[in-house]
Structures are given as C-alpha cells and as structure tokens.
Design a protein with these regions (language model features):
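Active-site-adjacent helix/loop patches that line small-molecule binding or acyl-intermediate pockets
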Residues: 1-25, 31-58, 104
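Active-site-adjacent bridging/hinge elements
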Residues: 17-31, 117, 149-157
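Long, low-complexity, intrinsically disordered segments
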Residues: 222-234
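A penicillin-recognizing enzyme superfamily signal
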Residues: 43-207, 214-221
Length: 234
C-alpha cells in the first residue's frame, strides 16, 4: 500500500480529502491532508463507507443516506416519507475507470473470494488496520453497495484468533460476509454489467519505482557530526 503515499502526494492531499467528502464521507469524520490520508487514516462509520461506495456504483451520483423510509399513522396515513436527495459529484468516465480498477481486487486481488462467490460483476477494496485491530470490506455491484467491518470494543485489541484464523484481514471474514449478503440479495435479479473503462490518460503504465516523496525541509533532522578520527598520521 505504500505506493499510494507518493501517488497521493502527486495528486494533492487536499484533493483526496475533497474526493472523500464528495463521495459521502461527512465533515463529522476528521480527515487531515497528510500523507497517511491516502492509506485510510480516518475513522468513518460503516454507513459512511457504504454510502461512498454507493456513489461509485451510481456512476458518480451521490445520494444522502436515510434509515427510515416511511412512517404510517394509525389509519395508515403517511406521516413521513423519506426522499432521495441525489447530486452528480463525479464524471461518469472517471467512475468507469475507478470501477475497472476496483474490480481487479475482487477477481484476482485480496478479495478474490468475492468474485468467486458472487459470480457477477463486483468491485471493492479490502482494508486492514495495524496489528489487525480492524478489518473491512467495502464494495458494490451495478445494483447495490455494502460495507462490512470487524473490530472489537477495545480498538487496541487484535482480531487475530477469531474463528481460528491466525490473521483476520479484510479479505477474510468481511469479504466472505459481504459476498454472501450480496449473493442472496441479488439471487433473483438479472446480471448487470459495469460500464467499460474509459482509459482516461491512456493505457501506458506509469512507474513510481523511483519516486521519492518530498519532505518538508523543516522536518528533516540535521545530519550527525562526523566522529573524530583517532588514527595517527604516518
């Protein structure tokens, strides 16, 4: 994942925060424009990430989530009706390329179990925090988006050992649960396809092998003074 640090710095850290906000991560979730923001250094709720991935599934249209759809009175009169508030926040071609990239994670990446079990177009991303203290899988199909998270009440405790696994990651239980939910949810639905990738900027690979992030000179510690030599001159 370290490649995303120089990539994020090249794209612009403020832009990363802006994209997250537009996708659906609310202002109540603290996000600081530092290099670690590219690695997920924030603490959103599960519904926040499900909402963000729903924006990707809807080809860049963000809809504000709501939990209560309808409230009926004693005479079955509708007292409250939830309304979809939607706005296009990303270009469709950008979302097509994003989906193409994320679909690789569910076919041959860390969440390959998703593609194998759902057996229809899927896209998503696993996430595992330091010391395996939390594990996530967020993903979508053309029809639905969902998020599954594992963590303990004490965020400092590791998940390792749960279910007999020595290492609990986003590609283990979270991905499996997500796959079973989506498989059941879409059991009788016709298979839909994602839009083809737009290949914005071309298809030539870009190398970051020799890319070194620039650091603020004020943060660079001074070089140590050379040790005095005890050798005698001849």
């Amino acid at each position: 994942n370290t490649i995303y640090v120089p990539l994020g710095m090249k794209a612009g850290l403020e832009k990363i925060v802006d994209v997250a906000r537009r996708a659906g991560i609310p202002d109540s979730v603290e996000m600081v424009a530092t290099p670690s923001v590219s690695l997920g250094a924030a603490s959103p709720h599960v519904i926040d990430l499900a909402n963000a991935y729903a924006t990707f599934a809807a080809q860049g249209v963000h809809a504000k989530p709501f939990i209560i759809n309808e409230v009926q009175g004693p005479n079955k009169g509708i007292l409250f009706q939830g309304r979809i508030q939607a706005q296009e926040v990303f270009r469709k071609d950008v979302m097509a390329d994003l989906t193409y990239a994320l679909s690789k994670a569910t076919t041959s990446g860390t969440a390959a179990v998703v593609g194998a079990r759902v057996a229809r177009p899927t896209a998503g991303k696993t996430g595992t925090s330091n010391d395996n203290a939390s594990a996530w899988f967020n993903g979508y199909t053309p029809e639905v988006a969902a998020s599954v998270a594992f963590y303990r009440d004490d965020a400092t405790q590791t998940l390792n050992g749960i279910g007999g696994l020595t290492s609990v990651t986003g590609g283990s239980f979270p991905a499996r649960i997500w796959a079973e939910f989506v498989k059941g949810y879409l059991k009788k639905a016709p298979v839909q396809e994602f839009p083809p990738p737009a290949y914005i900027g071309g298809i030539e690979p870009i190398s970051f092998i020799n890319s070194v992030p620039e650091m603020d000179p004020a943060l660079i510690p001074p070089s140590p003074s050379p040790s005095p030599s005890n050798k005698k001159k001849r």
